[in-house]
Amino acid sequence: MNTRRLFARSRLQLAFWYALVMGGILTLLGLGVYRAIVQANWMALEREVESIAGTLHDSLEPMLPSNASPTGVLQKMLPDLCLVNQPCQVNPTLIERHTLGISDRSLYYIRLFDYQGNLLAFSPNQPASLSSIFNQETWQTIHPPTGDRYRQFTTILHSAGNTDKSSWGYLQIGRSLAAFDAENKRILWILGLSFPIALGLVAFSSWGLAGLAMRPIYQSYQQQQQFTANAAHELRSPLASLLATVEAVLRIDSSHSPEINTMLHTVERQGRRLSQLITDLLLLSRLEQETTAEDWRLCCLNDLVSDLTEEFLELAIAAHIDLSSDLSSGEVYAWGNESQLYRLVSNLIANAIQYTTAGGRVDITLTSHEQMAIITVQDTGIGIAPDQQEHIFERFYRVNRDRSRKTGGTGLGLAIAQVITVKHRGSLTVESALGKGSLFTIQLPIFSVPIVHS
């Protein structure tokens, strides 16, 4: 995979997780702040209602006689309240004389009950659907079928002449929660508007911080790649000299003992293997560092596969393996670097022959489907275990290490193939089963060639 794309994806993932974590923290913090504000407003509202109820209680209790008719007393004490089962005329000064400085008197209503829980009087502005059945709970939240919610407080009233402090009745005062609910909605709206802005700032900051975090890693990776390329480049010359010397000694002086000749042949073989490894490392490093497509041109995949089949035919015959190819009836073109595409397919064919036993088959096919060129290399070889299939495209990974050493494999062939495929905006997949062989599939975008009519 292209190095820049790899690090860009890692940076994006790091920024995403950072933004996700910070977004979760901001969400929890916002919910906590909202909950704290709502709770504070709720407690302030209850204190206000309780304070007003206490003031009314202290004002009414001294004027409540123990033996007078409740109806007659209430008509004299509270002429602006509506009595049960009597006509009610709304007086504009109704609550103003009895709510003692309430800022918005229309938000409140008052109800009086006798000690048996029978409704005696009520404010004309109480909710129309409010039940007349007495509920002795101190605090209640009233939910009328229509309209606003109310918070209701109930307290006991005692008559002035009652020495045993038995109950004369009950006072209920309720407050509309319309303003409270509207304030909560306003807070939610502010938080809902602020959250995307904050999340956007967090995402922007996350991207910058992820870049700062990835910079030393990227620099370290570049230094490692540069070191690998430099080391491989510096090793090529002395290694070439060593191989030339060994070949010259073997060719000119044949008087050595069999042991020395064997050692020289071993040195030559290992030197060539090391030379191939250096070549592969340089190629892999160059592929990962390339960012331009200057050498790309139109490539006929039919010719490429046909040439490779002919090239590997002799090797397959020597290994007693049946090598065949089945090309698409029409010409299939791709846009890319021809030498790299050649290396891509040749690595797969070489691997297939290497891991197929004598008497087996290697089949190469070229087809096209939905603007994609599909090249498959299928063998009847030893196969790949499921737990190894996800690692075979890693550098220096070998399925069968002993066999790779005997055949001179470097462990970079499939890694190079994967890098070339991704560089050409394609995909490389494998399907395999132990003892049944493997199927490698390359998919590359098709380059449509315009048809010129003569």
UniProtKB/Swiss-Prot annotation:
<keyword id="KW-1133">Transmembrane helix</keyword>
<keyword id="KW-0808">Transferase</keyword>
<feature type="topological domain" description="Periplasmic">
    <location>
        <begin position="1"/>
        <end position="13"/>
    </location>
</feature>
<feature type="domain" description="Histidine kinase">
    <location>
        <begin position="230"/>
        <end position="448"/>
    </location>
</feature>
<keyword id="KW-0597">Phosphoprotein</keyword>
<comment type="function">
    <text>Member of two-component regulatory system RppA/RppB, involved in the establishment of the appropriate stoichiometry between the 2 photosystems. It senses changes in the plastoquinone (PQ) redox poise. Another group shows this two-component pair, renamed NrsR/NrsS, controls the nickel-dependent expression of the nrsBACD operon; they suggest the photosystem-related activities seen earlier are due to the expression of NrsS (RppB) in the absence of its natural substrate NrsR (RppA).</text>
</comment>
<feature type="transmembrane region" description="Helical">
    <location>
        <begin position="14"/>
        <end position="34"/>
    </location>
</feature>
<keyword id="KW-0472">Membrane</keyword>
<feature type="modified residue" description="Phosphohistidine; by autocatalysis">
    <location>
        <position position="233"/>
    </location>
</feature>
<dbReference type="Pfam" id="PF00512">
    <property type="entry name" value="HisKA"/>
</dbReference>
<keyword id="KW-0997">Cell inner membrane</keyword>
<dbReference type="InterPro" id="IPR005467">
    <property type="entry name" value="His_kinase_dom"/>
</dbReference>
<dbReference type="Pfam" id="PF02518">
    <property type="entry name" value="HATPase_c"/>
</dbReference>
<keyword id="KW-0812">Transmembrane</keyword>
<dbReference type="InterPro" id="IPR003661">
    <property type="entry name" value="HisK_dim/P_dom"/>
</dbReference>
<protein>
    <recommendedName>
        <fullName>Sensor histidine kinase RppB</fullName>
        <ecNumber>2.7.13.3</ecNumber>
    </recommendedName>
</protein>
<dbReference type="GO" id="GO:0000155">
    <property type="term" value="F:phosphorelay sensor kinase activity"/>
</dbReference>
<keyword id="KW-1003">Cell membrane</keyword>
<dbReference type="InterPro" id="IPR036890">
    <property type="entry name" value="HATPase_C_sf"/>
</dbReference>
<dbReference type="InterPro" id="IPR050736">
    <property type="entry name" value="Sensor_HK_Regulatory"/>
</dbReference>
<keyword id="KW-0902">Two-component regulatory system</keyword>
<keyword id="KW-0418">Kinase</keyword>
<dbReference type="InterPro" id="IPR004358">
    <property type="entry name" value="Sig_transdc_His_kin-like_C"/>
</dbReference>
<feature type="topological domain" description="Cytoplasmic">
    <location>
        <begin position="35"/>
        <end position="186"/>
    </location>
</feature>
<feature type="topological domain" description="Periplasmic">
    <location>
        <begin position="208"/>
        <end position="454"/>
    </location>
</feature>
<dbReference type="InterPro" id="IPR036097">
    <property type="entry name" value="HisK_dim/P_sf"/>
</dbReference>
<dbReference type="InterPro" id="IPR049835">
    <property type="entry name" value="RppB"/>
</dbReference>
<feature type="transmembrane region" description="Helical">
    <location>
        <begin position="187"/>
        <end position="207"/>
    </location>
</feature>
<dbReference type="GO" id="GO:0005886">
    <property type="term" value="C:plasma membrane"/>
</dbReference>
